[in-house]
Amino acid sequence: EEFLHHLEASLPVASDEEYTSAKKPLNIVDLGCGNAYLTFATYSFLKNTKSMDTNVVGVDVKRQSKEHNEAVAKELGWERDVSFVQGTIEQAEIPGSENVDVCIALHACDTATDQSLVRAVRWKTKLILASPCCHHDLHVRIKKSVTSSSSSSSSVLLAPMTSIARHGILYERTIDNVTDAWRALVLRILGYKVDVVEFIGGEHTARNTLIRARYTGAKATKELWDEHDAMVSSFGCESYLTEALKKELESRRISVT
């Protein structure tokens, strides 16, 4: 329910006559949909509550999830508007991917969140709602940098990180936040307006961060690039997302005057 409130508040097209008059359906992709609880809830909310013509595609790597979800959609009479694709987030072929309006990724583990962001960016998605889960990849990358730099003073930031890295729970929480801050920064450079918010109470799950990004096409500023370059130099590594979107990022850097 809380997620749907954020979706409603975030929709760049919620009051757009182009959609509400049914001249054009709102196209949504749910990456890593699992048993599609969110997929069906999103469709029902937009179609039945908001009266918006909506198409939703759920993507999951498991064939059994696809078959189960298709059966549920048929039972509900929604099979025309709600469909499912089996495949990885990186490689699944999405029908109508050139017209994706909203991309959802709820609790995609580790780099699956990054892979979802990559696909959303390359689809030029208008709205991205991603709730990250575990953050192992950057933990490993930064820990390697901390270890290799422990006897060096080359980085102002890595010195205190050595102390934090001694305590697993402190290191985990710190790098979780660094990971999501870096993701938000990359999206800003690529022309998105980004908010990072809590979308459900912490008593339900500790994984309650929502990255909410709306595409505006805003130009990447020198200040944003300075922040990005400081992240790389301070932590001594790239993130998964900066490597995956290297081409897109560099094209934005060239445009900075």
Segments and roles (model prediction):
Residues 6-22:
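Glycine-rich helix-loop-beta junction characteristic of Rossmann-like nucleotide cofactor-binding loops
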Residues 31, 40, 131-133:
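Short loop/turn segments at strand-loop or loop-helix junctions that form parts
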Residues 2-9, 25-27, 53-55, 59-257:
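Class I S-adenosyl-L-methionine
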Residues 35-51:
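Conserved SAM-binding loop of SAM-dependent methyltransferases across substrates and taxa
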Residues 13-14, 49-53:
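Inter-helical turn/loop segments and adjacent helix faces that build the functional surface
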Residues 24-34:
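Conserved class I S-adenosyl-L-methionine
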